[in-house]
């Protein structure tokens, strides 16, 4: 008869296995396919795992060659083990589960729009994002603005941006 300790270990391993297999139920089939494509692009040596060299090569292919080893190590440490596709999905599942709902994002923007016009000056938002809380870089803010609707007066349509942030695409009128 197996000892209690052995049974407990086996049960924990099964629970961990079930938890990682449930990650697929957190995503739609199309999302899983998109993640698989991204994983395949990053797995440069095609061994089924993303390692430090794969990350370096991926960054290089994006034109960023000055990534430090400690930055890559920090990325890899976010995973609890080797990064195969299931682990890759787990990591994204954890990141995406922290994404604010559209209403929460809208409410945050509304705090900066006392007149309720649905628009905020782009330069004002940029200054806030680069100087408050989790400070963003100018590059990160500019990337975000690529998905924003900005009028000729330089005002950001935050309702449209909130939709893009939470749904990944512009709302069709």
UniProtKB/Swiss-Prot annotation:
Taxonomically, the superkingdom here is Eukaryota
- Entry keyword annotation includes Translocase: no
Residues covered by the EF-hand domain: 30-65, 100-135, 136-171
Quaternary state and partners of this protein?
Myosin is a hexamer of 2 heavy chains and 4 light chains.
Q: Where Ca(2+) is bound, by residue? A: 43, 45, 47, 54
Any one Gene Ontology BP term:
regulation of muscle contraction
* Protein name, UniProt field: Myosin light chain 5
> Which keywords belong to this entry?
Calcium, Metal-binding, Motor protein, Muscle protein, Myosin, Repeat
Instruction: Note the coiled coil stretches, chain numbering.
Output: none
GO CC, one annotated term = cytosol
Q: Which Gene3D superfamilies match?
A: EF-hand
Which residue stretches belong to region Disordered?
A: 1-20
Q: What else is known?
A: This chain binds calcium.
Q: Does the keyword Repeat apply?
A: yes
Pfam families registered for this protein in UniProt: EF-hand_7
Tissue-by-tissue expression: Expressed in fetal skeletal muscle and retina.
Q: Which GO terms describe its molecular function?
A: calcium ion binding; structural constituent of muscle
- Cystine links in this protein are none
